């Protein structure tokens, strides 16, 4: 199936005039933007199609559709078309936003008058190739452009603005083929096949149609039956989104949770998070301590928070000595486990305190005794308590020797010199000693304790 355009239609200037009028109406439609630099409307001066456009039908569906509807896919090719438009723009940008701007923000200039610039734009050598979907229903034709390949030459009367306007026009051409041309072709087909009165009565204009859509969208209200069709999961997500909008409020709407958004902490719930942290301050802040009575109370004491960010014991606890070492150790362990939960190899740095015992008179007396040549540790051991008297024998000759009798049944151990059994490392490496129940009182004799190979000397 093929179609052929009537050359007489394109040769007659009436077709170009109709296209020019429709294009002027489409370009002068009310803009959605508040700010507009156009001082006057857009005037289409000339439209020319020197060559007949080519139309190739790629697909046509008539059988499956109703009789009043025809659907097809076509390829449109147009060459050497020309378009010339003219308008006036406002170069003083301060006047554009003067109505919507407060007077105290506007600068006081000496001359703030209007400065208009007429501009003429010419599009020549227009080449267009597009794949379109055509819908023919009753006397109207609807066309939607899918794949568009457009090329043209642009000339502007203001040369300094030519490159900027050309770049912006090429970026906004999708709006022309999406909105302007389909509405222009549809209105032209209505006026072509039907009378003007019937077309206006049956089909509203673009502005009325847009107003109808906006009014209908504002009056849309969900009925009770519509909520039954909604998914409960979607309703739950919507309710969570609505509740999460209270992040900037001064008072939290959810009392038992730290945040309405998972993973986020709100500012008004920061004190709850800090109060739940294990620390010495938070643990002892709940206890009541006696406060000093004073006639004047400062404002800082009235608004003093009940939590602190540092991990220290309060001064009142130290003064009253109401702390427990086991509780402090437990809190510090919880803090370490919380901070090193991801690191299993981390070891706590514990502070070790060595408690040294005070020196007793017996220890001071043992330090004054003569040291043995061997490096084995020797300390003083008292076999009986101090209160129990030790039986002593009479002095024997020579007078500088003294014998001591031990309470032990098996061995006789001297009172002042004995083996330190706690030093296991030294006794394991050295040979064992054999002690005799004699004690030298004068260091001038130079007697030595004997080993197993050489027994001690006797006189």
Swiss-Prot record:
Transmembrane segments: none annotated. Residues 1-190 form the SMP-LTD domain. It is a multi-pass membrane protein. Residues 338-347 have a biased composition (Basic and acidic residues). Its main location: mitochondrion. Signal peptide: none annotated. Keywords: Lipid transport, Lipid-binding, Membrane, Mitochondrion, Mitochondrion outer membrane, Transmembrane, Transmembrane beta strand, Transport, Ubl conjugation. One of its GO terms (cellular component) is ERMES complex. Residues 348-359 have a biased composition (Basic residues). GO terms for biological process: mitochondrial genome maintenance; mitochondrion-endoplasmic reticulum membrane tethering; phospholipid transport. Ubiquitinated by a SCF (SKP1-CUL1-F-box protein) E3 ubiquitin-protein ligase complex containing the F-box protein MDM30. Ubiquitination is important for mitochondrial integrity. It is found in: Mitochondrion outer membrane. Residues 338-375 are annotated as: Disordered. GO terms for molecular function: lipid binding. It comes from the Eukaryota. Component of the ER-mitochondria encounter structure (ERMES) or MDM complex, composed of MMM1, MDM10, MDM12 and MDM34. Lacks alpha-helical transmembrane segments, suggesting that it resides in the membrane via beta-sheet conformations similar to those predicted for other outer membrane proteins and porin. Belongs to the MDM34 family. Component of the ERMES/MDM complex, which serves as a molecular tether to connect the endoplasmic reticulum (ER) and mitochondria. Components of this complex are involved in the control of mitochondrial shape and protein biogenesis, and function in nonvesicular lipid trafficking between the ER and mitochondria. MDM34 is required for the interaction of the ER-resident membrane protein MMM1 and the outer mitochondrial membrane-resident beta-barrel protein MDM10. PANTHER family: MITOCHONDRIAL DISTRIBUTION AND MORPHOLOGY PROTEIN 34. This is Mitochondrial distribution and morphology protein 34. The gene is MDM34.
């Amino acid at each position: 199936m093929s179609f052929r355009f009537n050359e007489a239609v394109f040769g007659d200037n009436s077709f170009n005039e109709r296209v020019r009028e429709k294009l002027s109406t489409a370009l002068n439609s009310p803009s959605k933007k508040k700010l507009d630099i156009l001082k006057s409307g857009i005037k289409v001066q000339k439209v020319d199609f020197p060559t007949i456009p080519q139309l190739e039908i790629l697909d046509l569906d008539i059988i499956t559709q109703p009789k009043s509807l025809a659907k097809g896919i076509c390829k449109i090719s147009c060459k050497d078309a020309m378009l010339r438009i003219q308008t006036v723009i406002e170069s003083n940008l301060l006047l554009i936003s003067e109505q919507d701007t407060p007077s105290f923000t506007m600068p006081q200039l000496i001359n703030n008058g209007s400065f208009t610039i007429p501009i003429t734009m010419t599009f020549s050598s227009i080449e267009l190739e597009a794949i379109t979907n055509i819908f023919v229903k009753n006397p109207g034709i609807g066309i939607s452009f899918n794949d568009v390949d457009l090329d043209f030459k642009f000339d502007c009367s203001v040369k300094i603005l030519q490159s900027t306007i050309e770049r912006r026009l090429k970026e906004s051409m999708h709006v022309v083929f999406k909105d302007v041309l389909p509405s222009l072709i549809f209105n032209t087909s209505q006026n072509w096949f039907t009378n003007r009165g019937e077309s206006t009565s049956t089909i509203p204009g673009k502005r009325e149609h847009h107003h109808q859509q906006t009014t209908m969208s504002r009056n849309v209200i969900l009925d009770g039956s519509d909520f039954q069709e909604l998914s409960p999961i979607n309703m739950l997500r919507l309710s969570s989104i609505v509740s999460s909008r209270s992040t900037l409020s001064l008072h939290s709407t959810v009392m038992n949770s730290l945040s309405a958004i998972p993973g986020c902490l709100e500012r008004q719930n920061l004190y709850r998070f800090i109060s739940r942290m294990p620390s010495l301050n938070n643990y002892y802040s709940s206890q009541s301590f006696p406060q000093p009575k004073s006639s004047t109370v400062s404002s800082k004491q009235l608004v003093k928070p009940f939590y602190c960010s540092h991990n220290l014991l309060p001064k009142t606890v130290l003064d009253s000595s109401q702390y427990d070492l086991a509780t402090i150790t437990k809190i510090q362990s919880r803090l370490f486990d919380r901070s090193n939960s991801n690191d299993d190899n981390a070891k706590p740095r514990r502070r070790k305190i060595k408690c040294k015992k005070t020196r007793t008179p017996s220890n001071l007396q043992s330090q004054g005794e003569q040291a043995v040549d061997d490096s084995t540790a020797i300390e003083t051991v008292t076999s009986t308590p101090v209160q129990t008297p030790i039986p002593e024998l009479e002095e024997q000759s020579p007078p500088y020797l003294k014998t001591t009798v031990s309470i032990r049944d098996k061995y006789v151990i001297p009172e002042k010199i004995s083996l330190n059994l706690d030093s296991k490392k030294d006794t394991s490496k050295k040979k064992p000693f054999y002690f005799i129940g004699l004690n030298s009182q004068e260091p001038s004799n130079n007697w030595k304790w004997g080993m197993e190979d050489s027994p001690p000397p006797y006189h």
